[in-house]
Amino acid sequence: MSIRYIDEIENLSGKKLFMRVDFNVPLDDHQNITEDTRIRAVLPSINYALDQKAKIILASHLGRPKGERKEKYSMAPAAKRLSRLLGKEVKLASDCIGDEVKAMINAMQPGDVIMLENVRFYAGEEKNDADFAKALANDCDVYVNDAFAVSHRAHASVEAITNCFPVVAAGFLMKNEMNYFEKAMKNPIRPLVAILGGAKVSGKIEVLENLCDKVDKIIIGGGMAFTFLKGMGYNVGKSLVEDNLIDTAMKTYEKARAQGVKFYLPVDCVVADQFNPAAETKVCPIQEIPEGWMALDVGPATVTLFTEALQNAKTIVWNGPMGVFEMDAFSRGTFAMVSAVANSYALTIVGGGDTDVAVHRAGEYAKISYISTGGGAFLELLEGKKLPGIKVLEDKGHQ
């Protein structure tokens, strides 16, 4: 089965359209949204539904309230920001289920938009509970999932709820995410280069194993590189190493090499005597990391090596920073890679989370072909997994 998209649904006029979005946005201490990319990302789907004169009911989670109502996790800031972006009122419901919500939905006019309260205020959401899903559906007519970033979760508003609707579809954000992923992984223009960074190998080992069969080059930076380097016999001082994964990392490295994949690791690094922005730092080759010091960024020779490895790339997929870029002293490697990726002639796809933050901080996001809104979901696709939220859309797509 293939996924049906929102623009393939016949006659949305007057229909109650339930749309799962991901407005899990960062807030400051005063409940102000500090970054609204995820809200802006679903505007095309919302505007399309408005043009079709649908009644739009939006559902999302925010944070981890763990099945309890906590005001600091209210969807109020998101509803307010969306009102501003749409230039029209978005009413916030007092809850996401119940008679009061149902009455509010039944009173809607075509072109109205309602934001339901946080679906994770109920434990049934994360348990994928069928009864909660039925209550959440609120007798709506059509279900649209435009929340790629939570589609790796088998939660009630993502998976179980699809059984409550005769028509289910994906929104335009989901379409973009899937299209770009297929361009990178299903039929890429080669050479295809994967850049993986971040602190730990444990979060990326399945990704690496899957990528060995698909890519031409793998570049490894960040803390995860030091598990590989220790496995190769280097003394890495107090750098982050997952000793229990050294054997697995080395097997993956050997598998990549055996399949003709070029595998790049740091040749120098920025080391510090402590994990602190004010630490004493120096640049040294991988062979000369001082005892008791830790590597917190890749060094200039590594940046040159990695940049050269990207020279002939036609497709680049990147997930994970090169160092602890939140601290200025250890941010150069990540920002140099942002520049190299942004200025390459390749199709460039950046996976959400920290890498997304780095690209925005560097002011280079306009030069990246596509920035995914999903961190965990993007990684699970890279692992070769079927995401629960996407699988149900495929199964029920054009029934």
Curated annotation (Swiss-Prot):
CDD domains: Phosphoglycerate_kinase (cd00318). GO terms for cellular component: cytosol. SUPFAM superfamilies: Phosphoglycerate kinase. One of its GO terms (biological process) is glycolytic process. Substrate binds at D22, F23, N24, R38, H61, L62, G63, R64, R120, R153. Its EC number is 2.7.2.3. ATP binds at K204, E326, G352, G353, D354, T355. It is found in: Cytoplasm. It catalyses: (2R)-3-phosphoglycerate + ATP = (2R)-3-phospho-glyceroyl phosphate + ADP. GO terms for molecular function: ADP binding; ATP binding; phosphoglycerate kinase activity. Keywords: ATP-binding, Cytoplasm, Glycolysis, Kinase, Nucleotide-binding, Transferase. It holds the Pfam family PGK. Pathway: Carbohydrate degradation; glycolysis; pyruvate from D-glyceraldehyde 3-phosphate: step 2/5. The keyword Thylakoid does not apply. Belongs to the phosphoglycerate kinase family. Monomer. This is Phosphoglycerate kinase. The gene is pgk.
